[in-house]
């Protein structure tokens, strides 16, 4: 919004004063700081209201370790605070002409709506398991397809007819492998592959949100990682490099994305603004969600954040790399898949309880220790993902 205002008045005296708004780096930092301050400002009032509205509700699932019963009475649906701060920071500082920004907002808020329905059913019908899994999957698929529709445009065939095409690149990039070596094009099959990434990530974050602060810090780390990846893939910055021309070395300016051997992402800098808003909103929520938590994010937060991270993986062309970035989330959902498959096939359980963080709880590990160790692993995963930029 502020960027559009700057474009309108850029040739005036006021426009020269607001010249800093044209720099993505400023708007990235500003979006994060604004989302953080907004969350810290309205967080206490929102939590107090949630506690009042949910008085007498347990908000603790029955299929969790007995130690979780002490968390009864802690309000849920705190993810509404995260979504509000993300939307405000993005709308205020991103370039709203970018279609990618609107697609990410739609995907995030759409998945947040699904989470809201799930939380509301659990609260309104005590001991309810919320929205049925099949209905949840249908709604997740619906909002994903709406996002894909937002990325469609038309092109003209040689015979003059029109056909749809995706605005995003349908080629895949692999970590540690330059695109010039291996860069398969999935064509329209890419839509199905992206669906697995987006819906899978959303559900993985949802499964991870079982301990105080466990899901939000890996989300923050992932958002920071994606901010870097989006910025370098979308920036117009170039790097001095040598090129051999006619047997002689010549100094040339090589675009940063080309130098790093990754795909270009048009509008990547604006996606970085969105990432920064997630970081700011996440830090403000962590202030209230750290052990012992004053509020839980609920499905309204976990499904939305997972959808956002999956969407960023898709739009930044890091679908495969996201398996590294989301290492903790991937491990959590994988543990559930292993547990279910093992029990159905052999009648035996691999873990004491799934997702895997409950396994460590039942082994006697203290909740804060599990949380911090998972945070450390998440940071390492983000570092490895960024390292893959250079090792190509």
UniProtKB/Swiss-Prot annotation:
Pathway(s) where this gene product acts: Cell wall biogenesis; peptidoglycan biosynthesis
Highest classification ranks of the organism: Bacteria, Pseudomonadati, Myxococcota, Myxococcia, Myxococcales
Subcellular location: Cell inner membrane
GO cellular component labels: plasma membrane
Organism of origin: Myxococcus xanthus (strain DK1622)
Disulfide linkage: none
EC number from the UniProt entry: 2.7.8.13
Protein name, as recorded: Phospho-N-acetylmuramoyl-pentapeptide-transferase
Listed InterPro entries: Glycosyl_transferase_4, PNAcMuramoyl-5peptid_Trfase, PNAcMuramoyl-5peptid_Trfase_CS
Cofactor(s) named in the record: Mg(2+)
């Amino acid at each position: 919004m502020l960027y559009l205002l700057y474009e309108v008045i850029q040739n005036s005296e006021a426009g020269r004063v607001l010249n800093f708004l044209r720099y993505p780096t400023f708007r990235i930092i500003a979006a994060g700081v604004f989302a953080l301050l907004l969350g810290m400002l309205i967080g206490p009032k929102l939590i107090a209201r949630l506690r009042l509205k949910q008085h007498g509700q347990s908000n603790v699932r029955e299929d969790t370790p007995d130690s979780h019963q002490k968390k009864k009475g802690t309000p849920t649906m705190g993810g509404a605070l995260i979504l509000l701060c993300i939307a405000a920071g993005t709308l205020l500082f991103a370039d709203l002409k970018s279609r990618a920004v609107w697609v990410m907002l739609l995907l995030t808020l759409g998945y947040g709506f699904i989470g809201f329905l799930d939380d509301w059913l659990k609260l309104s019908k005590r001991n309810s398991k919320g929205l049925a899994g099949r209905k949840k999957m249908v709604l997740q698929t619906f909002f994903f397809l709406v996002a894909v529709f937002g990325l469609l445009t038309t092109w003209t065939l040689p015979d003059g007819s029109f056909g749809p095409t995706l605005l995003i690149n349908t080629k895949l990039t692999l970590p540690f492998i330059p695109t010039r070596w291996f860069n398969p094009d999935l064509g329209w099959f890419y839509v199905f592959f992206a669906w697995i990434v987006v819906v899978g990530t959303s559900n993985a974050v949802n499964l991870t949100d079982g301990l105080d602060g466990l899901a939000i810090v890996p989300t923050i780390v992932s958002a920071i990682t994606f901010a870097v990846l989006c910025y370098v893939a979308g920036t117009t910055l170039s790097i001095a490099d040598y090129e051999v021309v006619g047997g002689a070395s010549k100094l040339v300016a090589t675009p940063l994305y080309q130098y790093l051997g990754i795909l270009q992402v048009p509008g990547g800098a604006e996606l970085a603004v969105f990432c920064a808003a997630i970081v700011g909103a996440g830090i403000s929520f962590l202030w209230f969600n750290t052990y012992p938590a004053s509020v839980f994010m609920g499905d309204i937060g976990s499904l939305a954040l997972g959808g956002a991270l999956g969407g960023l993986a898709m739009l930044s062309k890091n679908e495969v790399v996201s398996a590294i970035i989301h290492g903790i989330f991937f491990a959590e959902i994988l543990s559930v898949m292993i547990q279910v498959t093992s029990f159905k096939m052999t009648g035996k359980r691999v873990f004491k309880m799934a997702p895997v963080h409950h396994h460590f709880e039942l082994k006697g590990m203290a909740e804060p220790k599990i949380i911090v160790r998972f945070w450390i692993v998440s940071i390492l995963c983000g570092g490895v993902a960024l390292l893959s930029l250079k090792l190509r």
